[in-house]
Amino acid sequence: MSFKDLFTPQDTVFFNLFEEQAEIACEASAQLVTIFEDYTNVEAKYRALKDIEHKGDATTHKAFDELNRTFITPLEPEEISRLVSSLDNVVDFIDEGARLLLTYNITQPDRFMLDFAKCIQQGAAEIKTGVSCLRSLKDPEIVKGCCIEINRLENVADELLTAALKNLFQSNDAIT
């Protein structure tokens, strides 16, 4: 055992929870794509997404409970808190986007909605890849690559939003 190993926490619970949260984000994004690929029974599909979101909340609570009772953590407690909150927010925002379909009584999605959902799904997959590399940090270039790809996907989503808004206001009736 090296000197460094004596002072480095060997507990993997946080990394397990990060990976669980990232997997839940992938599940939520896949469910969002499912909603748009077959826009029928939207309420039932949304309830399935809501169940995924509740699973994410439970994982978030476990992570914060663990953080509150762990003295020596593998990362700074503030970093753990930020990562846990950010991963939870991904799922919460996916849930909120799907909920608005029901709130606004969207009867037929436009062509941009599925593209947004697929972009979100790709981002969630990158998050999962990046988070899985945190455990060992043997290849930080993979994490960096995931961050760069997530930024690229954000730019794609920005372009989609611009195109969707342009399309909306070029139609005869921007309300419907």
What are these regions (language model features)?
Residues 1-176:
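Cytosolic, long alpha-helical scaffolding segments
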